[in-house]
Amino acid sequence: MEPLSEPDASDPILTITGPTAVGKTAVSLEAAEQLNAEIVSVDSRQVYEELTIGTAKPSPSEQRRAPHHFIGERSLHEPFSAGAYAKAANDRIRAVLERGRRPLVVGGATLYLHALQYGLADIPDVDDEVRDELNQRLESEGQDALYEELQQVDPRQAAETDPTKTQKVIRALEVYHGTGKPLSYYYENQPEPPFDYVTVVLNRDREKLYDRINQRVDRMLDAGLLDEVRDVMDIDGVQLDEPPLSTIGYREPIQHLKGDIDYDEMVRLVKRNTRRYAKRQLTWFRRYDEYHWRAAPETRAEDLIEVLKNALDPTHSAAEGSAR
């Protein structure tokens, strides 16, 4: 294979994404080894040190094959938002490039990926009292009155907001009253992301993907998922009803361990909810016309690198495939 030029900050960054259980880890490790790359994980749960089995975190042997970022770096006591992730990931990417290596973004957390590639509006925090007051007004005045106010103070945002989506109306008014500026101002002045990306979505036949999901859930349980959840439940100060513990693969075991559902129902729910999550991920990825789709079983690291080469040099031709 023709070697790539030395990495540069102006180069698009190869991103490998796809639904859960599609097989991103194996092919991304091969690509990282061939590219002399460091893997920048884009996963909203693998970043927590306490969550391993239920997040399908790369094993120690897999992590030794290439440097990994955002794997087990934070405690459950340290919330991590998509915006915070994007800022931290941009810093890591700069550091990787300064070391003369390529960053390779890998993962399927859709909002985190969007924040990294396209940015998020930098909206200041708003006092909870503002939202409380708006909710009281919702009760006394009704949603129509709040939407009419939004039309007056932020007509651009009102035009893009369904008046029946009450919480979105309240959020827009909350920003206006809390910051003195309309929500549309923050969206319109959103900073441009510092890097460009070329993204490959790995996909599989639906039934085969669902089979892989079911089998992976079984492996997680065999590997001790319930013990992991018990340990997490014993940590002082951890909120069991908030992310990441309210997410799939943790909330169902928590319900089981609390006695709310039996074991078989827990297994059924984890599998069903994970399949539904994979479907939502695929729907999200189809929003982006610039993404390249590939069939996971046939895709090798060389195929992914070929996509990167095409992005680096538009005159470099390669057959485009589709696995949507």
UniProtKB/Swiss-Prot annotation:
Segments for region (Interaction with substrate tRNA): 43-46
UniProt entry keywords in alphabetical sequence: ATP-binding, Magnesium, Nucleotide-binding, Transferase, tRNA processing
GO molecular function: ATP binding; tRNA dimethylallyltransferase activity
Role according to the record: Catalyzes the transfer of a dimethylallyl group onto the adenine at position 37 in tRNAs that read codons beginning with uridine, leading to the formation of N6-(dimethylallyl)adenosine (i(6)A).
Family membership noted in the UniProt record: Belongs to the IPP transferase family.
Subunit description: Monomer.
Protein name according to UniProt: tRNA dimethylallyltransferase
